C-alpha cells in the first residue's frame, strides 16, 4: 500500500457498466491520448456486468487530474459506463479493509 505522498502521480481508474464491445479499447485509447501510462489492469465480467480497475502513472500526463477526470467522465457517458478517476492514495484509503 502506498505511503503518504510518495504516489502522488498514481491514479486509479474504475470502469463499471453493462458489457459491450469497445470499452477497454476506448478507455486505454483515451489514457494513451493523455500520455498516461497503465501500470496494472484488472478486468472481469460477471453476469453481463463489466468491471475494470486500472492503476496508472500520470507523471507525464498532458493535462491536470481535473482535466483527466472530466475527459474520462465524458468518455464513460459516450461508452455507456461509469468511469471514475481518483488519486491512488484516496482510492486505497477508501477501500481499506
Where are these regions (language model features)?
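A conserved regulatory-domain signal marking ACT and ACT-like small-molecule sensing domains
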Residues: 2-97
Amino acid at each position: 500500500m502506498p505511503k503518504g505522498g510518495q504516489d502522488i502521480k498514481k491514479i486509479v481508474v474504475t470502469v463499471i457498466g453493462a458489457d459491450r464491445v469497445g470499452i477497454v479499447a476506448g478507455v486505454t485509447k483515451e489514457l494513451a491520448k493523455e500520455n498516461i501510462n497503465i501500470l496494472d489492469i484488472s478486468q472481469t465480467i460477471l453476469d453481463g456486468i463489466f468491471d475494470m480497475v486500472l492503476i496508472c502513472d500520470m507523471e507525464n500526463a498532458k493535462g491536470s487530474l481535473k482535466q483527466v477526470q472530466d475527459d474520462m467522465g465524458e468518455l464513460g457517458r459516450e461508452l455507456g459506463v461509469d468511469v471514475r478517476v481518483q488519486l491512488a492514495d484516496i482510492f486505497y484509503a477508501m477501500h481499506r479493509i
